[in-house]
């Protein structure tokens, strides 16, 4: 049985979850939350303070367990999002999973080298032979498959700094992911019967995501969060009743 942990470093709260896994099944074993230090607007400003927070969470949650994978959520403030269209020939006249894999790999390879590293890619639409956009291309016939991806990039040095925070922890692998990936998997978007929007209220920002036909259609980050609303509300009451 392997152990997997996930870390979300917010501007006000830091959350770590621990799960055990057997095959494709995961069982949540515990969650710890503490006040964040060293993070402003979703960006690490003081690595030593962040390291201390992480060590505190790990000591309480993991104890003597050996963690195989640590999944780290990245805020929209450190991600660069670009759209990329990839065209690959359909090998066996009808679209198979292997065609999707080739398109995905070609998209990742397009960003090889440079200062940016690919954190994740999400398909947001498919088309066959330049036809109209569809949500599911599998078993469709044609010559060429066109996939439109939303690509999430992050600065290589910034990711290396985060990995350095876990140095000496014994964790075998550090994985990064954007918040939208967590939304999609937690809500099982592919099986959702209806289109829906999700609003994530953070301390320093608000994420708005729209899913349609089981796929990501729209994503936006608003740089005004709950802390700003609270501050403005308190200021208004002070002016009115002070």
What are these regions (language model features)?
Residues 1-13, 17-196, 215-217, 240:
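Nucleotide/phosphate-binding catalytic cleft detector across ATP-hydrolyzing
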Residues 189-242:
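Acidic, glycine-rich loop-and-beta core segments that form the ion-binding/anion-interacting portion
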């Amino acid at each position: 049985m392997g152990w997997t942990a996930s870390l979300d470093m917010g501007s006000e709260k830091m959350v770590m979850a621990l799960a055990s896994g057997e095959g494709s099944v995961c069982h949540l074993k515990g969650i710890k939350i503490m006040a964040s230090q060293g993070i402003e607007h979703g960006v690490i400003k003081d690595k030593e303070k962040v390291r201390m927070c992480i060590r505190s969470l790990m000591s309480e949650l993991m104890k003597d367990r050996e963690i195989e994978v640590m999944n780290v959520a990245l805020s929209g403030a450190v991600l660069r999002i670009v759209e990329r269209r990839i065209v690959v020939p359909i090998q066996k006249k009808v679209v198979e999973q292997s065609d999707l894999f080739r398109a995905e790999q070609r998209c990742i390879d397009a960003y090889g080298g440079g200062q940016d590293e690919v954190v994740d890619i999400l398909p947001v639409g498919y088309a066959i032979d330049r036809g109209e956009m569809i949500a599911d291309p599998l078993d469709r016939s044609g010559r060429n498959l066109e996939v439109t991806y939303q690509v999430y990039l992050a600065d290589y040095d910034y990711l290396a700094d985060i990995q350095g925070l876990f140095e000496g922890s014994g964790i075998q692998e550090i994985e990064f992911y954007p918040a939208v990936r967590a939304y999609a998997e937690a809500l099982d978007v592919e099986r959702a019967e209806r289109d829906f929007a999700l609003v994530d209220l953070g301390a320093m920002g608000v994420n708005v995501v729209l899913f349609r036909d089981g796929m990501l259609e729209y994503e936006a980050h608003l740089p005004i969060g709950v802390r700003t609303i609270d501050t403005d509300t308190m200021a208004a009451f002070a002016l009115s009743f002070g």
